[in-house]
Structures are given as structure tokens and as C-alpha cells.
């Protein structure tokens, strides 16, 4: 019996200790310190203050003269603010209003009562509006509040309301040059057209003539190439700052040059032409619903996991290939409805600009092509092989973005269609496809550094240089598959294998393969849960997305599969289904300015 030990824990101990201190405080018993603030005296228990505040804990336990004093004078805070803070330390409750929060926050920061500081910040952020934003900024700055997340939430409000705030004199007065520069450099300002940001900057400069000395520096954070030419002529060149600022005149000249060189815009990649966008949107350019041709509409996968629709080129075009050059999209070839009412291979090329949500017709390819492959290397877009209704060919041509012209280059080694192309390490890899005899496992790489001379390219049908080089074949023959480069490797998904070309009898190829260029080897990975062809593919959040296509059960799909290359696993239903079942879709990730997305949101 004597050796038995049994432990007990009181469920009300913490509550009773707090209640005990409150009772002593209310009855005025054992109070051992008086705090003098302004003309007011506050009596309290040192032990209680030390448990609630790091400031008082150090004061009463460290070697400070106040440790043994019965009366302590505190300066730098108000009696009103401290009375609320003292009440919180005893009772755990506090009432805040816009009339008192200033003094309470001051007192809480003074005595290092972090919990009350957080309450004050949450209260202020919940109450923030255009009318009090400058006041709240000043309040947090005055007391050096740096609580995690507070500044981020304040900046988020400022960025969301930047233009209307810049019309308020109180905000213009308080906003510093340094803060203005940080906001103008932030991509979250994309909800406002660039001309509105420029006009906001003018308001800030005009508010105080002494600020004009910052004009040249500030102007460098305005992206004039994102404006329309009319805005630059009518609102920028006519302002007094255009005459005052050499930097502004330089930026305007750069923008006008950008507007004039329409075809070269994808190559003129500079800060002033870059979209303000924090995150790209998965974008689908659709071309077929079952066997029916549709206009090339654009679908956006937008949070919270919904699809939006934008307008596409006003021609019944099913683009077979897509190329991305610095956030410009080129849709090439495919099929279109001819004057005879039949579908024919197309040579048309369209360029999409998400900055203005606009389309531009570019120079046609030299020959109509469908079921071909493309790749972008430097300033060129390469189009490889393909077919028309009557002919399969091996010609290869490239589009020079600088002059909007096509020219033939060294042809592909064999006639082929239904193949896939992707650029890796500045080389264009072509995989699979259908030749004159069968579906192919072939992998061929095009190295532009080995291209023939102009004279050789002119005689393209007779001359084959060493531009094309065979690599290790895939494990499976396939056509109408998809390929994408990711982390220095090539991934191939799905497709079909044609067994009898005359009847186009085929079987599915659901396997996934990865190619390592360092070892020139293909490795088989996990197969797709539902095999398909004519699908789209892109990378999002370190996962490869496979969208739509024709499934092996004969049905067209609106589903999205995701593949994790690190875990070699497939998942379904990670993303919402597309609004329609699509075949022959082209997919990429694009940056859109928020003001374009806002307009799309209103239309959807």
C-alpha cells in the first residue's frame, strides 16, 4: 500500500487560478505595483503582469530598477489604451472600435501583448475600406506592426483597389515613393489596364511638385507596351510629364516601336511588354466536338475549378498544332471548311495575344498541312511533314517571326503524318506517326545548328543534310499521341497503332514512355487509366495533365487525367470536366491580365 502512487489532474485548475487573480483584483487585495500613465494610476499584481506580458516579465525578473519599485511611470502610451490592455490581462476580453483601436494597439505593442496586437490587426483589416485605408496604413507604420500575414493582407487590399485609392488625397499624401515603387513592380496590379496605372502615377506626382524628381525612376515600372496605341498618343504624349521626363519619352518610343513591329512582338520580350500576371491559366483551344467542326474557341480552367470561355478566330478551323512564343500563341494548319462544303487541309496561321484577348492572321504556310508537328527554336517555328486529303509529304518549313515569312528547310527523312513534335535542349524531337507502310516507333531529332545552306534548302526535294538524326526507338509504335518535355526529359502519352492502313483498323496504345536524352533510352511508365488519342497535354503544378480526346471505347472525352512523374501514378477527377467532349484540342498555360479575366467572368 505504501508504494502505490496515483496522480490526479484538475480540469478547472487554470480557470480557478485566473478566477483567483480576478477576485483579488476586484477586491483590491495583494496588489503590489502601481503603474502611472499620464495622470492615471493602475494597481495590479506583478505576478499576473509577468505571466501575460514579456515586457513586464523582463521588468520584474531581470536586473532592472523597476523590479523592486512599488510605483512605476510608463510613458509613450495613453491611459485609455492601457486600461483596455490591463482588463484583457485579467479578464481575457477586450472591446475594439475605430475610436479606440489606435490607443489599444499602441499600448499592446508597448507591453508586448501579442495576442491583443493580433486582435487589433484583425479588426482593422476587417474594417478596411477606401475611406480609412490611409489611416490604417499610418497606424501600422507608426507602431511598427510586423505580425505575420498582416502586411500581406493590407498590401492585397491596396493592390486590389490601387487605382481608386490613388484618387484620394489622404492616400496620395501618405503613400511614399518606396511603397509606390513596390506596388508598381507587383504583378497583382494586373486587374487594372496599364493606362489607368499611368494616370494614377500622374496623380501621385501632381500631388506634390517635389515628387517630380522621381518621375524617371517611377516611369520605368509602367508597362507602356501593354497599352493601346491610342492611349499612348492621346493620354501619355499629351501630358506635362512627357515634356519633363526624358525616360518617359524613351519608354514611349519603345512602345511605339513595339506597336509598329506587330509580327516581331513575340520576340520583343521586355519588362514593358510582359503581362502583369502572378499565375498562368490552363488554356484549351478546341477544334472538334465529336465529328463536328467548331470555331476555335478558347476555354480557361479558372479557380475555383470552373471553366470559362473566350472568343476564338472567326473561321471554322480545327488547328492541328500550337506553338508558344513568349506568351503569344500560334495556331497552325489543321482542317477548315472549303468552298465546296468539304473539309480540307489548311495552311492558315493565327496568332493569339492574351494581353488584348485578340487574334491576328499571320502569313500562311507554304503548303496546307494537317496531322503534322511543330516546334519553336529561337525565332523560328518549324512545321514538319503532314498530309492533305490526297498527299502525304516530308517537307519541312520554318516561320521566321521577325519578317512573317515561311521558308523550306531540310526535309524530314520520310513521308509521315500523325506524328508528334517537342523541343528539348534546342532540338526538335519527332516521334511516331504513320509512314507509307505502318505506324512507327521512330524517333528523329532535328538540330538547327546543322541546317544546310540556302542553296541546299532551295533544292529541298533533292538534298538531305545531316540535320536529322535517328535516336533510340520508342517501345511502342504509335500515332496521334501526345508528347511533352518536362524536367529535361520527354514524356509520350497514348495514341493508337494502325494495323491495317487501308481500313484504318487500329488498336489503342495506352502506355506512357519517358525518354532520357543523356542515355538515349526509353522507359515504360504506368499506363493511362483510360487510353486515348487526339487529346491535349500540359504541365500544371508539377503534374502532367491529359485532357479530352477519343477514348478506346469509341467515346469522346471531357475528362482530365493527371500524371505525377515523380511517383509514376495517374489520378482521375482532380480537375472538373470540360464543358464539352473534345477531340483534337490544343492545350497550353498562358498568362492573362486580370482585366481580361474580369471581362470573361462577366460574360460567363
Curated annotation (Swiss-Prot):
Keyword field contains Transmembrane helix = no
Compartments where located: Nucleus
- Tree of life domain: Eukaryota
Each Kelch repeat, start to end: 328-379, 381-426, 428-473, 489-542, 544-590
Where the record annotates domain BTB, the positions are 31-98
**Domain named BACK: residues:** 133-237
Its function?
A: Substrate-specific adapter for CUL3 E3 ubiquitin-protein ligase complex. Acts as an adapter for CUL3 to target the serine/threonine-protein phosphatase 2A (PP2A) subunit PPP2R5B for ubiquitination and subsequent proteasomal degradation, thus promoting exchange with other regulatory subunits and regulating PP2A holoenzyme composition. Acts as an adapter for CUL3 to target the DNA-end resection factor RBBP8/CtIP for ubiquitination and subsequent proteasomal degradation.
Q: Mind telling me what this protein is named?
A: Kelch-like protein 15
> Lineage in the entry?
Eukaryota, Metazoa, Chordata, Craniata, Vertebrata
Amino acid at each position: 500500500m505504501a508504494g502505490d502512487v496515483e496522480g490526479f489532474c484538475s480540469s478547472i485548475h487554470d480557470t480557478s487560478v485566473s478566477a483567483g487573480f480576478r477576485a483579488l483584483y476586484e477586491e483590491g487585495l495583494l496588489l503590489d505595483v502601481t503603474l502611472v500613465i499620464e495622470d492615471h494610476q493602475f494597481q495590479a499584481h506583478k505576478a499576473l503582469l509577468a505571466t501575460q506580458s514579456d515586457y513586464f516579465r523582463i521588468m520584474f525578473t531581470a536586473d532592472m530598477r523597476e523590479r523592486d519599485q512599488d510605483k512605476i511611470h510608463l510613458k509613450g502610451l495613453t491611459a485609455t489604451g492601457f486600461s483596455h490592455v490591463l482588463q484583457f490581462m485579467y479578464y481575457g476580453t477586450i472591446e475594439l472600435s475605430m475610436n479606440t483601436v489606435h490607443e489599444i494597439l499602441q499600448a499592446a505593442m508597448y507591453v508586448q501583448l501579442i495576442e491583443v496586437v493580433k486582435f487589433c490587426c484583425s479588426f482593422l483589416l476587417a474594417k478596411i475600406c477606401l475611406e480609412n485605408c490611409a489611416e490604417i496604413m499610418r497606424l501600422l507604420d507608426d507602431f511598427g506592426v510586423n505580425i505575420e500575414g498582416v502586411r500581406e493582407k493590407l498590401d492585397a487590399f491596396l493592390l486590389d483597389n490601387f487605382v481608386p485609392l490613388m484618387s484620394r488625397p489622404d492616400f496620395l499624401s501618405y503613400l511614399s515613393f518606396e511603397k509606390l515603387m513596390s506596388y508598381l513592380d507587383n504583378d497583382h496590379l494586373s486587374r487594372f489596364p496599364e493606362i489607368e496605372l499611368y494616370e494614377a502615377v500622374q496623380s501621385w506626382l501632381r500631388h506634390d511638385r517635389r515628387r517630380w524628381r522621381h518621375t524617371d525612376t517611377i516611369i520605368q515600372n509602367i508597362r507602356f507596351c501593354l497599352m493601346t496605341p491610342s492611349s499612348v498618343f492621346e493620354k501619355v504624349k499629351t501630358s506635362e510629364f512627357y515634356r519633363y521626363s526624358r525616360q518617359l519619352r524613351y519608354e514611349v518610343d519603345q512602345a511605339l516601336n513595339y506597336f509598329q513591329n506587330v509580327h516581331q512582338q513575340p520576340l520583343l520580350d521586355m519588362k514593358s511588354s510582359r503581362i502583369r500576371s502572378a499565375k498562368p491559366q490552363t488554356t484549351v483551344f478546341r477544334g472538334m466536338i465529336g465529328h463536328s467542326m467548331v470555331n476555335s474557341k478558347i476555354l480557361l480552367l479558372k479557380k475555383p475549378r470552373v471553366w470559362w470561355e473566350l472568343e476564338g478566330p472567326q473561321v471554322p478551323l480545327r488547328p492541328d498544332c500550337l506553338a508558344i512564343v513568349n506568351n503569344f500563341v500560334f495556331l497552325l494548319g489543321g482542317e477548315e471548311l472549303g468552298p465546296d462544303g468539304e473539309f480540307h487541309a489548311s495552311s492558315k496561321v493565327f496568332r493569339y495575344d492574351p494581353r488584348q484577348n485578340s487574334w491576328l492572321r499571320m502569313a500562311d504556310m507554304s503548303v496546307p498541312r494537317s496531322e503534322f508537328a511543330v516546334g519553336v527554336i529561337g525565332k523560328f517555328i518549324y512545321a514538319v511533314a503532314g498530309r492533305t486529303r490526297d498527299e502525304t509529304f516530308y517537307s519541312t518549313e520554318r516561320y521566321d517571326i521577325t519578317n512573317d515569312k515561311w521558308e523550306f528547310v531540310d526535309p524530314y527523312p520520310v513521308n509521315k503524318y500523325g506524328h508528334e513534335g517537342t523541343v528539348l535542349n534546342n532540338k526538335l524531337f519527332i516521334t511516331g506517326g504513320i509512314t507509307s507502310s505502318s505506324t512507327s516507333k521512330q524517333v528523329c531529332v532535328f538540330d538547327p545548328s546543322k541546317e544546310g545552306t540556302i542553296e541546299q534548302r532551295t533544292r529541298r526535294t533533292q538534298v538531305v543534310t545531316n540535320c536529322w538524326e535517328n535516336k533510340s526507338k520508342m517501345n511502342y509504335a504509335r500515332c496521334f499521341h501526345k508528347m511533352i518535355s518536362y524536367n529535361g526529359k520527354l514524356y509520350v502519352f497514348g495514341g493508337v497503332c494502325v494495323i491495317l492502313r487501308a481500313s484504318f483498323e487500329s488498336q489503342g496504345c495506352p502506355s506512357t514512355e519517358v525518354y532520357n536524352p543523356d542515355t538515349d533510352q526509353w522507359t515504360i511508365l504506368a499506363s493511362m487509366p483510360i487510353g486515348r488519342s487526339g487529346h491535349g497535354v500540359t504541365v500544371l503544378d508539377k503534374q502532367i495533365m491529359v485532357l479530352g480526346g477519343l477514348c478506346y471505347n469509341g467515346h469522346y472525352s471531357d475528362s482530365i487525367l493527371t500524371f505525377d512523374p515523380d511517383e509514376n501514378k495517374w489520378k482521375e477527377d482532380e480537375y472538373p470536366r470540360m464543358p464539352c467532349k473534345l477531340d483534337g484540342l490544343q492545350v497550353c498555360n498562358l498568362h492573362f491580365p486580370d482585366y481580361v479575366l474580369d471581362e470573361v467572368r462577366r460574360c460567363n
